[in-house]
């Protein structure tokens, strides 16, 4: 209950902040937020990754969706938004609450939510400029399938501590891909 109230308050504050700010400064704000999220996710580890080597799994991250050379800025921003949205959803479950230290989980969720707000403003701004709906749908579907594989893995492993550790490492990897995509976008601007 405390997590829900804290998260609700954070959502309200962050929503107000995003409504008051105009424009799309994606490269700077999102990149910093991504780094903070990576640091928090790194701090969330509870068990040694070496004790979970037998639980490793290839989730087949859709690397081509993080290749900023393949598509327009609007599509890249949509992919980043979907990746952060799916990460937020994954770490907002009851099973996730049981797996992680609550204050770190709240900070991580708040950071993701802020990134979602920043990205939503950019999606609205960029999609009006560049229309690539079919490519966007394919890219977003690839990201959703990736997170579906992660969720199925957690279910199959009964949300064990090692399963969550493997997923935590995988999400760190996907956030790193996201950071690299942002660097490429910055170079294009």
From Swiss-Prot:
GO terms for molecular function: cytokine activity; type I interferon receptor binding. The keyword Chaperone does not apply. GO terms for cellular component: extracellular region; extracellular space. Disulfide bonds join 24-122, 52-162. SMART domains: IFabd. Pfam families: Interferon (PF00143). Gene3D superfamilies: 1.20.1250.10. Residues 1-23 form the signal peptide. CDD domains: IFab (cd00095). GO terms for biological process: adaptive immune response; B cell activation involved in immune response; cellular response to virus; defense response to virus; humoral immune response; natural killer cell activation involved in immune response; response to exogenous dsRNA; T cell activation involved in immune response. It comes from the Eukaryota. Keywords: Antiviral defense, Cytokine, Disulfide bond, Secreted, Signal. It is found in: Secreted. Produced by macrophages, IFN-alpha have antiviral activities. Interferon stimulates the production of two enzymes: a protein kinase and an oligoadenylate synthetase. Belongs to the alpha/beta interferon family. This is Interferon alpha-10. It comes from Homo sapiens. The gene is IFNA10.
């Amino acid at each position: 209950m405390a997590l829900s109230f804290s998260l609700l308050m954070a959502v309200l504050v962050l929503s107000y902040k995003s409504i008051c700010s105009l424009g799309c400064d994606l490269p700077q704000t999102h990149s910093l937020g991504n780094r903070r999220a990576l640091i928090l996710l790194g701090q969330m580890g509870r068990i040694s990754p070496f004790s979970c080597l037998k639980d490793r799994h290839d989730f087949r991250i859709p690397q081509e969706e993080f290749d900023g050379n393949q598509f327009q800025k609007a599509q890249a921003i949509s992919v980043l938004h979907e990746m952060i949205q799916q990460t937020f959803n994954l770490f907002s479950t009851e099973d996730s609450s049981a797996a992680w230290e609550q204050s770190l989980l709240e900070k991580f969720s708040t950071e993701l939510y802020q990134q979602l707000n920043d990205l939503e403003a950019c999606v609205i701004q960029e999609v009006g400029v560049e229309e690539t709906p079919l490519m966007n749908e394919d890219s977003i579907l690839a990201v959703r399938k990736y997170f579906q594989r992660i969720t199925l893995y957690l279910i199959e492993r009964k949300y064990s501590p090692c399963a969550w550790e493997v997923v935590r490492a995988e999400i760190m990897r996907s956030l790193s891909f996201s950071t690299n995509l942002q660097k490429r976008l910055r170079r294009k601007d």
